Amino acid sequence: MANLFPALRTPLYNLITEQTTKLTTFGGWEMPVQFAGLKQEHQAVREKVGMFDISHMGKFVLTGQKVLAALQSLVPSDLDRLTPGKAQYTVLLNAQGGIIDDIIVYDQGKNPEGQERVTLIVNAATTVKDKQWLLEHLPEEIDFQDLSREKVLIALQGPEALTILQPLVDQNLGELPAFGHLEAEFLREKAFIARTGYTGEDGFEIMVSPEVGKQLWQTFGSKGVTPCGLGARDTLRLEAGMGLYGQDMNDETTPLEAGLGWLVHLDSKGDFIGRAVLTEQKANGVEKRLVGLEMLAKQIARHDYPILHNGEIMGIVTSGTLSPTLQKAIALGYVPTELAKVGQELEVEVRGKTYGIKVVKKLFYRSEQKPR
C-alpha cells in the first residue's frame, strides 16, 4: 500500500542525492544519513569543518507588540535577559512541566514600525505540534509566519567554519558571540546568520531562500567543506552531551529531570505554564535524572536498553553510540536520583546479557575553540 503521507524533501534534496544515496526518513523528512562515511564526517567537524542540511527544522517568525512578553508565559527561561542580536535556548512546557519541545528564541529587535520581531527554530518532528500550541497560547494580534518549508537552513560547523564563511559577508563574524545572530547581505539577499549549532564545535546556522541555499551549499563544497548526514550529527551532539527531543526528553519529562535546570529561572520571572510543577520539584528534588553513561565493556548501550542495579531494572538508556572522538561507548539515560552520582556503577542489558556501565558527566567532549 502506498504511503498516504510521503516524506517531505528539502530544497537541497536534488543536490544531496547527487552526493549520496544513503537516506532515511526523520521527522517526516527524507534526509541523508551519511555521505563519505560517519567517522570521516564526524572527524571533519571536530578537526576542520562540515556542513549539514537542516532545512527540515521548523522556522517561525513572530511579529508584533510584546512578542517576548507573550513567550515568557510559555517557557521557564527569563526572556527579559535577551537583547536584540542574542538568542536563548529554552523549552516549551505543558501544564505538567513536561517538555513539548526544545527550541531557540532569537531576538531580532524591532522592525521600522516599532514591532518586535522574534524567530523561533524548533525540531522537525514537532513543528506541527509546536505551531498549534503557539497559536493557541499567543495573542491573536501577534503575526505568526511559518517559514518551515520556505527557507533553507544550513549548519556550517567546526573550527574552520569562521574561515569559510567570513569572506562571503561584510560583517565581522568573529565578533559574534555564541548565540549571537545578525542579518547579512549574501548574493543580493538578506541571510539570517546565527552562531549556534548542535555539534559542540564553533559554527554557524544560515537561513536563506532555496535559490541562495543551493548556491551556498555548492559554494561551501567548492571550498572543501565536508557534507555531513544525520549519523554524524547524532554522534557529535551526543559527545557534546546534547539531548535529542523524542529520545532524551519528551512531554513526560521536565527540564529539571532532563538536566536542563539551567534553563529554569524561577527567581527572576513571573508565572508560566508548568511553573507549579517545577517549583515543587525544585523544592523537593526529582525522582529521576538524565545522566551521562560510559560502558565498562566493548558493548554499545542503545536507545531503550534497560539499566539495572543489583539485578533490578532501575532506568533506561535514551541515546547511545561508540564515540568516534573518545573511542568509548557512551550513552545518556534516566536513573533514580540516588543512583545519579558521577562514579556510580550500574549494569545495562544488551541482547539478554548484562554489562558494566558507570555514571559520568554528560559533557563527554568539550571543544577548546568554541566561543563562550
Swiss-Prot record:
Give me the disulphide-bonded residues.
none
Query: What reaction(s) does this enzyme catalyze?
Result: N(6)-[(R)-S(8)-aminomethyldihydrolipoyl]-L-lysyl-[protein] + (6S)-5,6,7,8-tetrahydrofolate = N(6)-[(R)-dihydrolipoyl]-L-lysyl-[protein] + (6R)-5,10-methylene-5,6,7,8-tetrahydrofolate + NH4(+)
Tell me the keywords, alphabetical order: Aminotransferase, Transferase
Gene Ontology annotations for the cellular component aspect, listed alphabetically: cytosol; glycine cleavage complex
UniProt cross-references to Gene3D superfamilies, sorted A to Z: Aminomethyltransferase beta-barrel domains (3.30.70.1400), Aminomethyltransferase fragment (4.10.1250.10), Probable tRNA modification gtpase trme, domain 1 (3.30.1360.120)
Q: What is its EC number?
A: 2.1.2.10
Q: What class of enzyme is it?
A: transferase
| GO biological process per UniProt | glycine decarboxylation via glycine cleavage system
Keyword Oxidoreductase: yes or no? no
Q: Which GO terms describe its molecular function?
A: aminomethyltransferase activity; transaminase activity
> What is the purpose of this protein?
The glycine cleavage system catalyzes the degradation of glycine.
Its subunit composition reads: The glycine cleavage system is composed of four proteins: P, T, L and H.
Q: Which family does it belong to?
A: Belongs to the GcvT family.
Q: What is this protein called?
A: Aminomethyltransferase
